[in-house]
């Protein structure tokens, strides 16, 4: 077969296969042309779901008579002139093929009048050779484009169109998406002569919120968190719905790049990752987000429908979006309970998460008496992994961040007999240990310490009970371990070793932790006491990896933070560190802080609010790695004996 150049009409119809998928894609292209023309009012009129008629009317700059024919030609555009323009596209359209493609599969009429022109002129594309006829017309300033009988000359394409209702729903969605990105423009949509949508121009912030509520619903605004974060040459703004407004489908996921509506995988992944631990499975977030950045930093010429883009610094953009969204969500949800979980009956007073305690609360806990026990309602049969086997096997129970399975309050006879078999002490066992005098108790504890140190493997962990307590078996009975206290000791040791390793590997004589620059500096408000403390101890905090500057009278801007705390909320972690150091300095009557104080305070900030079985397993492995043969001693020091035998007997 010989090679031949395709006829213009056939070439345009092939191009239309990418540009014109359905009536909604025609409307998208025409509205974007109106926006590029500077229109502030756009009216969309459709009949029969856009299959019979589509008419777009705007008040934009218009097209002069001499360029009407050219406007219907392929690759004819006023938006780019050179390769430099293509690399920094600021308009919504730029390829110059939409009108030519549409006119090749429909009957198109273009009427336009620039303000500088006395009369309006109309261009009609018709015939097999797509000849354009020009004639005068009556029309106000602006442009109207009428598209009749879409796909009339391509029956195969027309056959794939859906019902009138379905096609109009796609049109409605396109108009809604575009209306969200252009508050400065009024939009109206009519279908079969009936007005369906009417969005007035929004010039104030309140009017913008009103439009968002009209598009996404008032409940979205009620549950939304507003964000507006500039950073370098990027700005992310818009609204994020709290996880309580999660959706069963992704019908309220609106993202825009430089005013262009997107379904970009990178953007969606960053947003989904920010919601990752907050949403129940099989649900979707709701958001309206606008990303503004330098046009030279994004390539929009990578997708036929321009729904996807390519960022020159994709990882940087991804992390920026994730950081802003995650920070906004966690800040908004601070103090809120995201999901309902089963209540635990375990009450060890005054134990709480060290991360949630203030300095006064923690100080009070040091002088508290031995806590009383209310035994938990739990399945005593399910064991936790043995600490020595933890690295070789997975957790025996699955943990979900959004809730727990409700546990039965009944203790089966099998469970009771299992625990009865575990309890094999001699006379004067754990019950006696609790009731002995001070000297006898010290002697018993010393004996148990020696026994545990000689046989670490004889400690078997049985189960974990939230918020952070574990039962484990020793030769002398069952003990209740505070995972909070154990974590404080373990993380303090981890920070200490990290400090020493950094000092040994660095040529710098100044001891310092590995510091990690923050992608987005964090602004933190401090009390007068806290501010005076951090300013006075700025040098030692800097050595520990905490770098900040004073921004306002009572605010600091955190720029770098210890890498060990990368998983923690920066603001909360720093408050914990500051309060702990202030408390320690008050105990030492104003003496200079030492390295150990820093180790302990940073370790305290790493303690979680609660521990499930997986997190407890990780903590125990880390404790064993850091303390080696002292593991059993650490377990003993952070636990109390439990007389489970007498408790089980009361159940029968």
UniProtKB/Swiss-Prot annotation:
GO process annotations (BP): mismatch repair
UniProt cross-references to Pfam families, sorted A to Z: DNA_mis_repair, HATPase_c_3, MutL_C
Similarity-based family: Belongs to the DNA mismatch repair MutL/HexB family.
Region of interest: Disordered: 357-377, 425-457
Role noted for this protein: This protein is involved in the repair of mismatches in DNA. It is required for dam-dependent methyl-directed DNA mismatch repair. May act as a 'molecular matchmaker', a protein that promotes the formation of a stable complex between two or more DNA-binding proteins in an ATP-dependent manner without itself being part of a final effector complex.
Keywords: DNA damage, DNA repair
Top-level taxonomic group: Bacteria
Keyword Lipid metabolism: no
KW DNA damage (keyword) present: yes
Database matches in InterPro entries: DNA_mismatch_repair_CS, DNA_mismatch_repair_MutL, DNA_mismatch_S5_2-like, HATPase_C_sf, MutL/Mlh/PMS, MutL/Mlh/Pms-like, MutL_C, MutL_C_regsub
Record-level GO cellular component terms: mismatch repair complex
SUPFAM superfamilies registered for this protein in UniProt: ATPase domain of HSP90 chaperone/DNA topoisomerase II/histidine kinase, DNA mismatch repair protein MutL, Ribosomal protein S5 domain 2-like
Protein species of origin: Colwellia psychrerythraea (strain 34H / ATCC BAA-681) (Vibrio psychroerythus)
GO molecular-function terms, A-Z: ATP binding; ATP hydrolysis activity; ATP-dependent DNA damage sensor activity; mismatched DNA binding
UniProt feature, compositional bias: Polar residues: 365-375
NCBIfam families, A to Z: mutl (TIGR00585), PRK00095.1-1 (NF000948)
UniProt name for this protein: DNA mismatch repair protein MutL
């Amino acid at each position: 077969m010989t090679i031949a150049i395709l006829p213009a009409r056939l070439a345009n119809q092939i191009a239309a296969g990418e540009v014109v998928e359905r009536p909604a894609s025609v409307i998208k292209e025409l509205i974007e042309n109106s926006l590029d023309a500077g229109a502030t009012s756009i009216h969309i009129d459709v009949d029969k779901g856009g299959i019979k008629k589509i008419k777009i009317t705007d008040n934009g700059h218009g097209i002069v008579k001499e360029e009407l024919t050219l406007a219907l030609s392929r690759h004819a555009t006023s938006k780019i002139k050179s390769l430099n323009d293509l690399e920094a596209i600021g308009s919504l359209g730029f390829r110059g093929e939409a009108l030519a493609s549409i006119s090749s599969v429909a009957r198109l009429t273009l009427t336009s009048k620039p303000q500088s022109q006395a009369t309006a002129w109309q261009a009609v594309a018709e015939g097999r050779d797509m000849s354009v006829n020009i004639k005068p017309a009556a029309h106000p300033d602006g442009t109207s484009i009428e598209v009749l009988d879409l796909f009339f000359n391509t029956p195969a394409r027309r056959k794939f169109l859906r019902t009138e209702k379905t096609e109009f729903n796609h049109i409605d969605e396109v108009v809604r998406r575009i209306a969200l990105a252009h508050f400065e423009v009024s939009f109206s949509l009519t279908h079969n002569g009936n007005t369906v949508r009417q969005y007035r121009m929004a010039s104030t912030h309140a009017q913008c919120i009103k439009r968002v509520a009209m598009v996404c619903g008032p409940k979205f605004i009620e549950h939304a968190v507003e964000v507006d974060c500039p950073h370098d040459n990027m700005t992310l703004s818009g609204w994020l719905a709290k996880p309580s407004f999660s959706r069963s489908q992704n019908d309220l996921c609106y993202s825009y790049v430089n005013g262009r509506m997107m379904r970009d995988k990178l953007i969606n992944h960053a947003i989904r990752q920010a919601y990752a631990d907050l949403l129940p499975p099989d649900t979707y977030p709701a958001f309206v987000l606008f990303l503004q950045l330098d046009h030279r930093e994004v390539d929009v010429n990578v997708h036929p429908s321009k729904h996807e883009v390519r960022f020159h610094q994709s990882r940087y953009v991804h992390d920026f979006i994730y950081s802003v969204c995650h920070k906004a969500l966690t800040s908004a949800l601070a103090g809120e309970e995201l999901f309902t979980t089963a209540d635990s009956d375990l009450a060890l007073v005054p134990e709480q998460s060290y991360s949630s305690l203030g300095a006064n609360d923690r100080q009070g806990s040091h002088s508290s008496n031995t806590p009383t026990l209310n035994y938990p309602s739990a399945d005593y049969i399910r064991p936790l992994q043995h600490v020595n086997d933890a690295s070789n096997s997975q957790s025996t129970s699955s943990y979900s961040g959004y809730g727990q399975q409700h546990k039965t309050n009944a203790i089966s006879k099998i469970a009771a007999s299992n625990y009865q078999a575990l309890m094999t002490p001699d006379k004067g066992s754990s019950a006696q240990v609790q009731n002995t005098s001070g000297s006898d108790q010290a002697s018993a504890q010393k004996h148990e310490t020696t026994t545990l140190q000689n046989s670490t493997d004889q400690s078997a962990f049985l189960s974990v009970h939230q918020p952070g307590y574990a039962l484990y078996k020793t030769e002398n009975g069952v003990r209740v371990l505070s995972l909070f206290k154990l974590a404080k000791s373990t993380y303090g040791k981890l920070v200490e070793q990290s400090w020493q390793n950094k000092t040994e590997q660095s040529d710098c004589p100044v001891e310092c932790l590995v510091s990690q620059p923050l992608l987005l500096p964090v602004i933190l408000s401090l009390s007068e006491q806290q501010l005076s403390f951090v300013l006075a101890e700025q040098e030692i905090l800097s050595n520990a990896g905490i770098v900040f500057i004073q921004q306002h009278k009572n605010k600091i801007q955190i720029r770098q933070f210890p890498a060990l705390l990368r998983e923690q909320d920066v603001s909360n972690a720093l408050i914990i560190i500051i309060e702990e150091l202030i408390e320690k300095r008050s105990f030492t009557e104003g003496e200079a802080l030492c390295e150990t104080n820093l180790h302990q305070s940073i370790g305290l900030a790493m303690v979680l609010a609660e521990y499930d079985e997986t997190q407890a397993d990780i903590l125990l492995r880390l404790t064993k790695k850091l303390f080696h043969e002292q593991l059993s001693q650490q377990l003993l020091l952070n636990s109390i004996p439990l007389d489970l035998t007498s408790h089980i007997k009361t159940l029968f």
